[in-house]
């Protein structure tokens, strides 16, 4: 897991972990995990935090080691990277920069990516993903469409 980070990042994570691990027992609690993550500019929701804990606390003792913490940070970082990539893809399709993707923009963007798509297929895709019925895809609608397509 450590290979997901640079030595400098690992050192930063370790320093943050040690600051919270006041008794130096090598473990932090869920509450302390929240503090560490907030100190590093992360603000996970309660459900996300619970899932992270379930992923690493296999014995159910509520303790998180530094290795567990690195795993959690790697998961969190990869989710952020995926979000950043999705934003970039959205911007590529949103050619006029209005925050919405039209049927024409979707079709042109897909053709630019080497995908053969007809105007009718682009229209169908927008209609299927267009939750508010305005004929355009917002970032939220586009994200849902892309996530559904990946499964």
UniProtKB/Swiss-Prot annotation:
It comes from the Eukaryota. The keyword Metal-binding applies. GO terms for cellular component: cytosol; nucleus. Ca(2+) 1 binds at residues 94, 96, 98, 105. Transmembrane segments: none annotated. Induction: By touch and during darkness conditions. Pfam families: EF-hand_7. One of its GO terms (biological process) is response to salt stress. GO terms for molecular function: calcium ion binding. InterPro entries: CALM/Myosin/TropC-like (IPR050230), EF-hand-dom_pair (IPR011992), EF_Hand_1_Ca_BS (IPR018247), EF_hand_dom (IPR002048). Potential calcium sensor. Interacts with IQD1. Interacts with ILK1. Binds to ABCG36. This is Calmodulin-like protein 9.
């Amino acid at each position: 897991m450590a290979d997901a980070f640079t030595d400098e990042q690992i050192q930063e994570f370790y320093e943050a972990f040690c600051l919270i691990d006041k008794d130096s027992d090598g473990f932090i609690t869920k509450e302390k995990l929240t503090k560490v993550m907030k100190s590093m500019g992360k603000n996970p929701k309660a459900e996300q935090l619970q899932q992270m804990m379930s992923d690493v606390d296999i014995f159910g003792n509520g303790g998180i080691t530094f290795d567990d913490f690195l795993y959690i940070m790697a998961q969190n970082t990869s989710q952020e990277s995926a979000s950043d990539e999705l934003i970039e893809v959205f911007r590529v399709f949103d050619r006029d920069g209005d925050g919405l993707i039209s049927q024409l923009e979707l079709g042109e963007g897909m053709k630019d990516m080497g995908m053969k798509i007809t105007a009718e297929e682009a229209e169908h895709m927008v209609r299927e993903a267009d939750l508010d019925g305005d004929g355009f895809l917002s970032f939220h609608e586009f994200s849902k469409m892309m996530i559904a397509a990946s499964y």
